UniProtKB/Swiss-Prot annotation:
Disulfide bonds: none
GO biological process, one term: autophagy
Coiled coil: none
Functional note: Plays an essential role in autophagy.
Protein name from the UniProt record: Transmembrane 9 superfamily member 1
The species this protein was found in: Pongo abelii (Sumatran orangutan)
Keyword Protein biosynthesis (UniProt): no
Family listed: Belongs to the nonaspanin (TM9SF) (TC 9.A.2) family.
Residues annotated as signal peptide: 1-27
Length: 606
């Protein structure tokens, strides 16, 4: 066979227009762009195939011994489609708009024993194919397997050789597409001797029906006996439970802490007025708690460059996550495919690099940092280096196994070009603005030259305990929704409840801010002024809980297996936990900083 129109050629039309990373076909707001007349040809593309329980382990459909044209012509793909592992190619199926086909022969094949064994292995691994009609995915199983555990034991494997396509239209647009094998018996692949050939006849039928649904987004893709139940009530119960947690934490911070602080401030200021003749050291001897460390609480932390880089990249991902959710709320993504989300994430990451540079450089200059160039390099490397290392391992495994998830060299070159020409320069530009607009750190209290000795702390005020409490509470607020997100990313479910996702994201940030303030207050009350890094680690540890949940999900909630899927799952789960660490660590730090400024600015000090 001859391959025409290699899918890698798509990059040639992308290089001159890097900013249009969302591509064509799956771009924002694109839905039903093709209009047909009765009898017009409708192209069906074959795409990819792979184990049902391993969605990221995909191979080209024509790698199986199936009907294919003499010359394989590939469809020009967008960036999002390539990132999603798509490799669309023209097929032998002839479909015309609104024309039914009872039964049409696709091709006749003579399969060798090796080819039959390849099909048997694919069916035993529950291979699941994907075709594409007018940007609508059509999915189904390659064959049928029946296992009997009773005596006599039987193990039957059959290949579906007749596919029944059902398409729904509205006016001149295709709204829905599906494939089934109803009333069709599979062709048995059992009992073939090594020197025998198996003759097969592949056929198909097409049924058209008109629908009252006007938009594809209104037609649930699972209405044809979908794989997943509708659990909207569970989502809302999760929201309610999380909101209760938020109200409890906000009430704890706003009522209990503020009342304690009000009493402490009143007593502190009263004692200062009655002992104005004494020295500050004498006063310190008669006081305790967070008030006594007012000369040390704003002492700059070690590794300030790394801290500022964490805050900068965390702020960038906060903007990136918010942008993705808002775009989803506006209906800018195709709910049936993830390619546009991948493209949007790359575009937003490149554009929001200016945020990381600005925040990092601005705060670094405020707290007295002098190595500005090193700070920018650290900021640009804090996420990109771990991501590149993880991607290199994952992509190498895909490439070694011939998976379509392995990115072509042209795609890699394009993404590197985007980072070098857009991401890195914007980080530097943001850093320059941040450095030039930074004013000296405005501390309400003067810092002594000699650091105060920190008394021994009880076990429940240790960093590990704070990380456990500060990570578990935000995680518990999103744990239910996290299952559905994992089932979408690492499974076959379709997630469309972006409004609920927005609420959950807001709840996550609110819980993180509240618990950070509470933990910081408890730390300061023990005369421990090393809150800078502690505030980042305490709530940032939510990322660790998310990674631990991913391990639980892999072991107990999924049927994923094999080196390809396992390496990708744990590699990107580690990155996901790292991103949440950066985001929530940033929220936690600035919440604690705002809280500390508030309580110390109200102290009367000379």
């Amino acid at each position: 066979m001859t391959v025409v129109g290699n899918p890698r050629s798509w990059s040639c039309r992308w290089l001159p227009i890097l900013i249009l990373l969302l591509g064509t076909g799956h771009g924002p707001g694109v839905e039903g762009v093709t209009h047909y007349k009765a009898g017009d040809p409708v192209i069906l593309y074959v795409n990819k195939v792979g184990p049902y329980h391993n969605p990221q382990e995909t191979y080209h459909y024509y790698q199986l011994p199936v009907c294919c044209p003499e010359k394989i012509r590939h469809k020009s793909l967008s960036l999002g489609e390539v990132l999603d592992g798509d490799r669309m190619a023209e097929s032998l199926y002839e479909i015309r708009f609104r024309e039914n086909v009872e039964k049409r022969i696709l091709c006749h094949m003579q399969l060798s024993s090796a080819q039959v064994e390849q099909l048997r292995q694919a069916i035993e691994e529950l291979y699941y194919f994907e075709f594409v009609v007018d940007d609508l995915p059509i999915r189904g199983f390659v064959g049928y397997m029946e296992e009997s555990g009773f005596l006599p034991h039987s193990h039957k494997i059959g290949l579906w050789t007749h596919l029944d396509f059902h398409l729904e239209f509205r006016g001149d647009r295709i709204i829905f597409a599906n494939v089934s094998v109803r009333d069709v018996k599979p062709h048995s692949l059992d009992g073939l001797r090594p020197d025998e050939f198996l003759g097969l006849t592949h056929a198909y039928s097409v049924r058209w029906s008109e629908t009252s649904v006007e938009r594809r987004s209104d037609r649930r893709h699972g209405d044809d006996g979908g794989f997943f139940p509708r659990t909207l009530e569970i989502h809302w119960l999760s929201i309610i439970n999380s909101m209760v947690l938020v109200f409890l934490l906000v009430g704890f911070v706003a009522v209990i802490l503020m009342r304690v602080l009000r009493n402490d401030l009143a007593r502190y200021n009263l004692d200062e007025e009655t002992t104005s003749a004494g020295s500050g050291d004498d006063f310190d001897q008669g006081d305790n708690g967070w008030k006594i460390i007012h000369t040390d609480v704003f002492r700059f932390p070690p590794y300030r460059g790394l801290l500022c880089a964490v805050l900068g990249v965390g702020a960038q991902f906060l903007a990136l996550g918010t942008g993705i959710i808002v775009m989803a709320l506006l209906g800018m993504f195709n709910v049936h495919r993830h390619g546009a989300i991948n493209s949007a994430a790359i575009l937003l990451y490149a554009l929001t690099c200016c945020i990381s540079g600005y925040v990092s450089s601005h705060f670094y200059r405020q707290i007295g940092g002098e190595r500005w160039v090193w700070n920018i390099i650290l900021t640009t490397s804090l996420f990109s280096v771990p991501f590149f290392l993880t991607w290199s391992v994952v992509n190498s495994v895909h490439w070694a196994n011939g998976s379509t998830q392995a990115l072509p060299a042209t795609t890699i070159l394009l993404l590197l070009t985007v980072w070098l020409l857009v991401g890195f320069p914007l980080t530097v530009i943001g850093g320059i603005f941040g450095k030039n607009n930074a004013s000296p750190f405005d501390a309400p209290c003067r810092t002594k030259n000699i650091a105060r000795e920190i008394p021994p702390q009880p076990w429940y005020k240790s960093t590990v305990i704070h990380m456990t409490v500060g990570g578990f509470l935000p995680f518990s607020a999103i744990s239910v929704e996290l299952y559905y997100i994992f089932a979408t990313v690492w499974g076959r479910e379709q997630y469309t409840l972006y409004g609920i996702l927005f609420f959950v994201f807001a709840i996550l940030l609110s819980v993180g801010a509240c618990i950070s303030i509470a933990l910081t207050y408890f730390q300061l009350s023990g005369e421990d002024y090393r809150w800078w890094w502690r505030s980042v680690l305490s709530v940032g540890s939510t990322g660790l809980f998310i990674f631990l949940y991913s391990v639980f999900y892999y072991a107990r909630r999924s049927n994923m297996s094999g080196a390809v899927q396992t390496v990708e799952f744990f590699g990107y789960s580690l990155l996901t936990g790292y991103v949440f660490f950066l985001m929530l660590g940033t929220i936690s730090f600035f919440s604690s900083l705002k809280f500390i400024r508030y309580i110390y600015v109200n102290l009367k000090m000379d």
